[in-house]
């Protein structure tokens, strides 16, 4: 089967556990996910089946929205609720106004240092493996983009914020850095991913929904179409001649002024056909094709 599931990941399991459960329910090996969530985090995780796995890479350019609870006055070695407490300090002096003004410093492009408990590699080893051995190493700072950050409420010592951010943002690091700026320390108490591009909590499924669909013989019916993952890409409709060229792996010429990194191609019936990318000579080549090549007519 080919398609996408918008799964609401429950607390306490890994993103790989989600993939394993989907593989079991669908009896399908070719399954992948579109964005890791830590075990303590919940919320949206798109899961791709069959040919849709070829679209996972295009999710890197879409934004994600999180609902985060941050507790002031405490730091942990993992920057979240799973770690050991490393620092305590009173936060009685912190006001809502102070928090609001400090949060505004995090809007736009910011520099983050990945937590030691992360999947980033250092000399070929995952940082979390080093951290579990009690080893701390210097991490390379990274640029992250915060499109919006909203303080929802603050009841000392816990604040709730909604964050819209780009690919590669560590909400744990944001919580840690916020605490440092306020002078009292902080850690990420809980995290919910509310949206990831076209996918959001409102139309997500849990595993009970999948099991029910399996019992009813409707597993295929709950899959989202492939193009759900690339709704953010510019699109173009092409005639049969150009579609045939793409299906056969040949480049095409488009009269386009802009040159985005990728364009979604649809046919005259409004069916998703391919992803094309520009070449330096002005042509476009098929990066991914999702309809099969028609048999060539017999030369005789």
Swiss-Prot record:
One of its GO terms (molecular function) is RNA binding. The active site is at residue 38. InterPro entries: PsdUridine_synth_cat_dom_sf, PsdUridine_synth_N, tRNA_psdUridine_synth_TruB, TruB_C. It is an enzyme of class 5 (isomerase). GO terms for biological process: mRNA pseudouridine synthesis; tRNA pseudouridine synthesis. The keyword Transmembrane does not apply. It catalyses: uridine(55) in tRNA = pseudouridine(55) in tRNA. Keywords: Isomerase, tRNA processing. Its EC number is 5.4.99.25. Belongs to the pseudouridine synthase TruB family. Type 1 subfamily. Responsible for synthesis of pseudouridine from uracil-55 in the psi GC loop of transfer RNAs. HAMAP family: TruB_bact. This is tRNA pseudouridine synthase B. It comes from Dehalococcoides mccartyi (strain CBDB1).
């Amino acid at each position: 089967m080919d398609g996408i599931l918008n799964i609401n990941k429950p607390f306490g399991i890994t993103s790989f556990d989600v993939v394993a459960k989907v593989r079991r329910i669908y009896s399908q090996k070719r399954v992948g996910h579109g964005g890791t969530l830590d075990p303590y985090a919940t919320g949206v995780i798109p899961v791709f089946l069959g040919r849709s796995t070829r679209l996972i890479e295009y999710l890197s350019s879409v934004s994600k929205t999180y609902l985060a609870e941050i507790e002031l006055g405490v730091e942990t070695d993992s920057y979240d609720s799973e770690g050991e407490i490393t620092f305590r300090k009173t936060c009685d002096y912190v006001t809502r106004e102070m928090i609001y003004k400090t949060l505004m410093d995090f809007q736009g492009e910011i520099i983050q240092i990945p937590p030691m408990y992360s999947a980033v590699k250092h000399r070929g080893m995952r940082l979390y493996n080093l951290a579990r051995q009690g080893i701390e190493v210097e991490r390379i700072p990274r640029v992250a983009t915060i499109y919006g950050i909203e303080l929802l409420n603050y009841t000392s010592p816990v604040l709730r914020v909604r964050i819209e951010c780009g690919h590669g943002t560590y909400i744990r690091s944001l919580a840690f850095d916020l605490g440092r700026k306020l002078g009292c320390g902080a850690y990420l108490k809980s995290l919910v991913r509310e949206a990831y591009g076209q996918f959001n909590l409102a139309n997500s499924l849990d595993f009970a929904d999948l099991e029910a669909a399996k019992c009813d013989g409707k597993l295929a019916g709950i899959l989202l179409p492939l193009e759900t993952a690339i709704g953010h890409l510019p699109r173009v409709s092409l005639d049969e001649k150009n579609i045939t060229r793409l299906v056969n792996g040949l480049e095409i010429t488009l009269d386009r002024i802009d040159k985005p990194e990728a364009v979604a191609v649809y046919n005259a019936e409004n069916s998703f056909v391919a992803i094309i990318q520009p070449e330096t000579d002005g042509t476009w080549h098929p990066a991914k094709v999702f309809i099969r090549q028609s048999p060539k007519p017999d030369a005789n």
